[in-house]
Amino acid sequence: MAATAMRMIISIIFISTYMTHITLCQNITEEFYQSTCSAVSRGYLSALRTGWYTSVVTIELSKIQKNVCKSTDSKVKLIKQELERYNNAVIELQSLMQNEPASFSRAKRGIPELIHYTRNSTKRFYGLMGKKRKRRFLGFLLGIGSAIASGVAVSKVLHLEGEVNKIKNALLSTNKAVVSLSNGVSVLTSKVLDLKNYIDKELLPKVNNHDCRISNIETVIEFQQKNNRLLEIAREFSVNAGITTPLSTYMLTNSELLSLINDMPITNDQKKLMSSNVQIVRQQSYSIMSVVKEEVIAYVVQLPIYGVIDTPCWKLHTSPLCTTDNKEGSNICLTRTDRGWYCDNAGSVSFFPQAETCKVQSNRVFCDTMNSLTLPTDVNLCNTDIFNTKYDCKIMTSKTDISSSVITSIGAIVSCYGKTKCTASNKNRGIIKTFSNGCDYVSNKGVDTVSVGNTLYYVNKLEGKALYIKGEPIINYYDPLVFPSDEFDASIAQVNAKINQSLAFIRRSDELLHSVDVGKSTTNVVITTIIIVIVVVILMLIAVGLLFYCKTRSTPIMLGKDQLSGINNLSFSK
C-alpha cells in the first residue's frame, strides 16, 4: 500500500513537472517586425550570475610503502599496477605544483597561450574579423582570467605555511568545516576519505605481507573504482594546466555538489534553482588545482551565484533587410546589430551580445553578467520604433544582398534576395511556402525545415504564439545614391548624419555649379552689351557721315556778277 501511494505521489510530481514545463514553453511569444526584419522572443526568466562562491576540497592520501608481496597471482599484479598508477598520479600533481600555484601560473601565462593557440587554430576565421570584433573576441578569452580571480586568490593562500594543516585540523572530526584563511577569507572546506580509508584499512593489510591474502577479483575492482577518481582528477588538471571547466563529477560528485549548494549563503529559491539545474551549474563552474603536501591534495571549486533570478528575459533575432526593386548588384542593405539576450536587472537592462554564452534550460536563461552590457530600458524602443529619439539603435549597412535564414525560438526569419530560391517545408507535405524577394517570417506551425538556396535549416519545435507585425521596410526610406555602405558598427543617427552630409555636399556642389553658370551668363551679357554699343556707335558714325555727305551735295553754286555778265553777253552776241 505504501509503495502504491509512493508511486502515485511520484506520478503526480512527474505529471505536475511535465505540465509546468509545457505551460512554461507555451508562454513563449514571438513578435516579428517586418519593418526592421527582426523578431523578439519573450517569455523567458532570468538566472544571472553576479558572483562566485569558492570552496576547498581535500583528498587525503595514504603512505604507500614499498610492498613486499612476492606473489605472481594475476590479481596481485593488477593491484600492483593500480598502486603504481596511484603513485604516478600523485607525482604528476606534485610536478604540476612544484614551482607555483597552477592557477596563478595559468592566470599569468596560460590565458595568453590560449589566445595564441586560438589565433593559430582559427587563422582563417580570425583574418576575416574586423578590428573591433577582434578586440571583443580577445576580451572574451581574457574574461576567463577575471572569472577565476577569486578562486586564484584562495589557491595562492593555500601555499602559505600552515594553511593546509589548518584545514586538516579543522576536518579532524568532521567532513566539512568553515576555515578562516590568513587573508581573512572564510571558505567552506570538505574532505574525501573514501580512497584513503580503503587503501589504509582494506588494501595495504593484504598486500604488505608475504602471503598476499587477495582471495577474489572484487578487491581489485573496488580499488580500481575508488582509485579512478584520483586518476581522473590528475588527468584533468594535467591536461588543462591546473584549471578546468566545466566542473566534472570527478572533481565534485552530484551528492557533494548538492550538499555544497545547500551550504551556500543564498536564498532557498536560489538553492532550488541551482539544485534543479546542476548540469548548467557545472558548465559555469571551475576547479583550480592548489597544492599537494602534508599528504593532502587540495583544490578550489568555484561555483556561480545567481544573484538575479525570475526577471523577464527576451532574445532578439535579426536578419539583413535589403531593397529589391533595383538592378542586381545595386541594392542596399541594413541589419540590426543589437541581437542577443536581454534581461531586466534592477531598473536597467543587462544585454548579452554573445547569445551563445547564455545557457537555456526550458524557459530559464542562465547568463554571466561578466559578458553583459548595462543598457537603459529605452533600448526596447528599437523594436517598435527604430527611429526613436530616446535611444540610438545599432545597425550595420552594406550593398551586398546575401540570402540567409535565422532560426528563432518558434519560427524562422528568411532574407531572400536575387535569384535564390527560398522555401518552407513540412516533412509530410513537402514545400508549403515559397518566399518572394525581401524579408519574411514563418512560424513553426506545420513547418519543419526552411531552405535558402542549398542550405537547409531545421526550426525549433517549442510551443508558443507568433505575431506578425507588418510595416514598410525602413530600407525603402533611403536613397541608394547617398546610402553609406560597409558601416559595420554604426547607429541610425550616425547613418542619417552621413546621409545628411552627403546631401549637404550635393547641395553645395549644385550651388557652386549654379554660381559658375550665373557668372558665365553675366559675362556673356556684358560682352553682348559692349558689342551692341560698338555696333550702335559705328552705325551712328556712319549715319553722321552720310548726313554730312548728303548735306554737302545739296548746297547751290553761287556765280559772281562778272560770270553772269559774260554769259549774258554771249547770249546777246549771237
UniProtKB/Swiss-Prot annotation:
<keyword id="KW-1133">Transmembrane helix</keyword>
<feature type="lipid moiety-binding region" description="S-palmitoyl cysteine; by host">
    <location>
        <position position="550"/>
    </location>
</feature>
<comment type="similarity">
    <text>Belongs to the paramyxoviruses fusion glycoprotein family.</text>
</comment>
<feature type="disulfide bond">
    <location>
        <begin position="313"/>
        <end position="343"/>
    </location>
</feature>
<protein>
    <recommendedName>
        <fullName>Fusion glycoprotein F0</fullName>
    </recommendedName>
</protein>
<keyword id="KW-1015">Disulfide bond</keyword>
<keyword id="KW-0175">Coiled coil</keyword>
<dbReference type="GO" id="GO:0019031">
    <property type="term" value="C:viral envelope"/>
</dbReference>
<dbReference type="Pfam" id="PF00523">
    <property type="entry name" value="Fusion_gly"/>
</dbReference>
<feature type="glycosylation site" description="N-linked (GlcNAc...) asparagine; by host">
    <location>
        <position position="500"/>
    </location>
</feature>
<dbReference type="GO" id="GO:0046718">
    <property type="term" value="P:symbiont entry into host cell"/>
</dbReference>
<feature type="glycosylation site" description="N-linked (GlcNAc...) asparagine; by host">
    <location>
        <position position="120"/>
    </location>
</feature>
<dbReference type="InterPro" id="IPR000776">
    <property type="entry name" value="Fusion_F0_Paramyxovir"/>
</dbReference>
<dbReference type="GO" id="GO:0016020">
    <property type="term" value="C:membrane"/>
</dbReference>
<feature type="coiled-coil region">
    <location>
        <begin position="158"/>
        <end position="209"/>
    </location>
</feature>
<keyword id="KW-1169">Fusion of virus membrane with host cell membrane</keyword>
<keyword id="KW-0812">Transmembrane</keyword>
<keyword id="KW-1234">Viral attachment to host entry receptor</keyword>
<feature type="disulfide bond" description="Interchain (between F2 and F1 chains)">
    <location>
        <begin position="69"/>
        <end position="212"/>
    </location>
</feature>
<feature type="disulfide bond">
    <location>
        <begin position="416"/>
        <end position="422"/>
    </location>
</feature>
<feature type="site" description="Cleavage; by host furin-like protease">
    <location>
        <begin position="136"/>
        <end position="137"/>
    </location>
</feature>
<dbReference type="GO" id="GO:0020002">
    <property type="term" value="C:host cell plasma membrane"/>
</dbReference>
<feature type="transmembrane region" description="Helical">
    <location>
        <begin position="525"/>
        <end position="550"/>
    </location>
</feature>
<feature type="region of interest" description="Fusion peptide">
    <location>
        <begin position="137"/>
        <end position="157"/>
    </location>
</feature>
<keyword id="KW-0946">Virion</keyword>
<keyword id="KW-1043">Host membrane</keyword>
<keyword id="KW-0945">Host-virus interaction</keyword>
<keyword id="KW-0472">Membrane</keyword>
<feature type="signal peptide">
    <location>
        <begin position="1"/>
        <end position="25"/>
    </location>
</feature>
<feature type="site" description="Cleavage; by host furin-like protease">
    <location>
        <begin position="109"/>
        <end position="110"/>
    </location>
</feature>
<feature type="disulfide bond" description="Interchain (between F2 and F1 chains)">
    <location>
        <begin position="37"/>
        <end position="439"/>
    </location>
</feature>
<dbReference type="GO" id="GO:0098670">
    <property type="term" value="P:entry receptor-mediated virion attachment to host cell"/>
</dbReference>
<feature type="disulfide bond">
    <location>
        <begin position="382"/>
        <end position="393"/>
    </location>
</feature>
<feature type="disulfide bond">
    <location>
        <begin position="322"/>
        <end position="333"/>
    </location>
</feature>
<keyword id="KW-1032">Host cell membrane</keyword>
<keyword id="KW-0564">Palmitate</keyword>
<keyword id="KW-1162">Viral penetration into host cytoplasm</keyword>
<keyword id="KW-0449">Lipoprotein</keyword>
<keyword id="KW-1161">Viral attachment to host cell</keyword>
<feature type="coiled-coil region">
    <location>
        <begin position="481"/>
        <end position="516"/>
    </location>
</feature>
<keyword id="KW-0165">Cleavage on pair of basic residues</keyword>
<dbReference type="GO" id="GO:0060141">
    <property type="term" value="P:symbiont-mediated induction of syncytium formation"/>
</dbReference>
